Amino acid sequence: MKKIFALTITILALSGLLSAQTLNVQVGQVTYQFPAEQAGVMTYAAGSTVHIMDKVFALSDVNMMYVDGAEVVDNRVAVVYNGETASVSVAGNVAKYLTISVTGAHVNIAQSDDVAEEITYTLSGNSTDGEFYMSGSYKATLELNGLTLT
């Protein structure tokens, strides 16, 4: 019985270690996704900001932080339109290079000139009053995945 219990505990512990964990930081309609193996040290400053992978978040702006098993693909931004709203998911490795604002289904992304690699933006969903605006001087890829904007 003790061997079975020990084996069960070991299997559960290993399955937890082998599954990917992602720290999600939600600010308004934007979710920044940081893979646990990349997040490193997260520093808090004066109880008002947190630094994660060189992205600074004002804690007063953060709606929630949670951990899940979502897979994060580096250099990816996903924009999903749903009627009069849009949500944006940002890979943690490019979060510090982007300034994002979302108002309803209107998405505006400014890409820093400091970004070293191409970022892929994937747009999907539908909206009768949606917009996507992106600015920046570095090369980017725009994927339209069943997108309907009118």
Regions found by a protein language model. Name each.
Residues I4-S15:
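Sec-dependent N-terminal signal peptides
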Residues L18-V25:
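Boundary at the C-terminal end of the N-terminal hydrophobic targeting segment
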Residues Q29, M53-D54, G146:
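Residue-level detection of beta-strand-connecting loop/turn positions
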Residues Y32-F34, F57, A86:
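Short, isolated positions in well-ordered beta-strands
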Residues P35-Y44, A58-A70:
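Structured surface patches comprising rigid loops and adjacent beta-strands/short helices at the edges
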Residues G47-I52, G69-V73:
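Short acidic, Gly/Pro-enriched loop/turn segments at secondary-structure junctions
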Residues G69-T150:
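A composition-driven surface/loop motif
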